[in-house]
Regions:
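Extracytoplasmic/secretory-pathway proteins
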Residues: 27-33, 37-168
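Bacterial Sec-dependent N-terminal signal peptides
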Residues: 1-30
């Protein structure tokens, strides 16, 4: 009887490992398709495939794949439609606020800090000439922010990414 239980346990373990290997293979297959679409300069295909990867990863609660898919998808969306940056930032802000895993939350806050810093740097000339009308009220649209508001937002996300650093 014990021998049978060991065999059953071993069998279930092998099935579990096999399923996780299948998941990894399916991600590998999808990422290879993304790579081929990149080489062929097919941004719409990259966006579609990374959207599929994101949905699959979300169902499986696979945060690393979700993050990777988000970064790729957002990058290609912004190349096609630069205004998508603003929606992408809002989505990532929501994700960072609702994320329960401290490691994933820290990564998201770090990515957000980088995105805001990159935006600030690429629009520095315009921002330097902008006059703050009401410092206490931050506009919903980042295109209306002052450089001070960007610095505060970047600092907020950097601090949030390090908030649980002892446990990370």
């Amino acid at each position: 009887m014990k021998r049978f239980q060991k065999k059953c346990t071993l069998f279930l373990l092998l099935i579990g490992l096999g399923l996780s290997a299948l998941h990894a293979q399916s991600y590998d297959k999808l990422w290879k398709q993304v790579e081929q679409a990149q080489k062929k300069s097919l941004p719409q295909t990259v966006i579609k495939l990374t959207g599929e990867i994101y949905q699959k990863a979300e169902k499986e609660k696979n945060a690393p794949q979700m993050l990777k898919a988000t970064i790729y998808r957002d990058t290609y969306q912004e190349k096609l439609t630069p205004d998508s940056l603003y929606a992408n930032l809002k989505n990532m802000e929501f994700w960072a606020q609702s994320e329960q895993n401290p490691v994933n939350k820290a990564i998201l806050h770090s990515l957000l800090a980088r995105e805001y810093a990159d935006y600030m740097q690429s629009n520095r000339a315009v921002l330097m000439n902008r006059i703050a009308l009401d410092i206490n009220e931050i506009p919903a649209d980042i295109r209306e922010w002052t450089i001070t508001q960007f610095v505060a937002k970047i600092d907020e996300h950097n601090c949030a990414s390090l908030q649980d650093s002892i446990n990370l």
